[in-house]
Design a protein with these regions (language model features):
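Alpha-solenoid helical-repeat scaffolds
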Residues: 1-37
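Eukaryotic scaffolding regions of large macromolecular assemblies
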Residues: 36-244
Length: 244
């Protein structure tokens, strides 16, 4: 695919790209027992696919995986190919950062997530929860290392990358399609609360607007609940929700 543009175009034009990508992801799942050279080839192939806008859009909107029997950590079903790819990139990054610490793996996972971020749509609950969980885990680890002046650039870059993904996925035009990510953000608001006052200005500047978004969302929910209680008790029409 790298040296033959015609072949790459042929592959990207296929309607069944999931048949190509799923075996690659399954092999990645067995990363501890996979030769590094094989993992490198898989990441390069996924990176080339993620550079195509049409692939990214199709992976999130049209290509759905009914079940993932090889994913042993929990039952995963009816997940978009895009969400599954994001889950696998995050899983690989976490494994790599705690054990192998292979710079090539890190860089390619970063690049794949970055390529897919602008096209995230219909993100599944498990993927949304995984994004926030990784931000939380890496943020806590970074905080401990910060106290010992041992913060690594990769930890900061990963937090920035994932906060950018969240912010992009929750922009006004995409929010209605990524409500699971909004719910995950609300449930884990303490994560962005902490990051909004981080000493790193890039992290703080990305987390602060997300805190404001959560505040507004919670205010709307509370207002609607109060209105429903008022209407049920008195039969009076509810007050209008606050405007953003």
């Amino acid at each position: 695919m790298h040296a033959n543009k015609e072949f790459k175009d042929f592959v990207l034009a296929r309607d069944d790209l999931d048949c190509i990508v799923l075996p690659l992801l399954e092999t990645m799942y067995a990363a501890p027992s996979v030769a590094p050279s094989h993992l490198y080839v898989i990441l390069i192939l996924l990176l080339m696919l993620s550079e195509d806008v049409a692939f990214n859009e199709g992976a999130h909107r049209r290509m759905h995986v009914p079940s993932v029997p090889w994913f042993a950590e929990r039952a995963v079903s009816d997940i978009s190919l895009g969400s599954l790819m994001l889950v696998m990139m995050l899983r690989t990054l976490q494994y790599n950062s705690t054990r192998a610490m292979d710079a090539f793996v890190h860089e390619n996972c970063f690049a794949i997530i970055s390529n897919m971020a602008p096209h995230v749509r219909g993100i599944e609950n498990y993927c949304a929860q995984r994004v926030m969980s990784v931000v939380d885990v890496i943020g806590r680890r970074r905080k401990k290392r910060e106290a010992r002046a041992e913060v690594t650039e990769d930890e900061t870059r990963l937090i920035v990358l994932l906060l950018e993904l969240v912010a992009t996925s929750l922009r006004p035009s995409m929010l209605p399609f990524n409500l699971e990510l909004m719910y995950a953000l609300v449930q884990r608001r303490e994560v962005v609360d902490t990051l909004s006052v981080d000493m790193d200005t890039d992290i703080a500047s990305l987390a602060a607007p997300l805190v404001s978004m959560v505040d507004f969302f919670e205010n709307v929910v509370e207002t609607e609940r109060a209105a429903e209680c008022h209407e049920a008790a008195s039969g009076a029409p509810p007050p209008p929700p606050p405007r953003g």
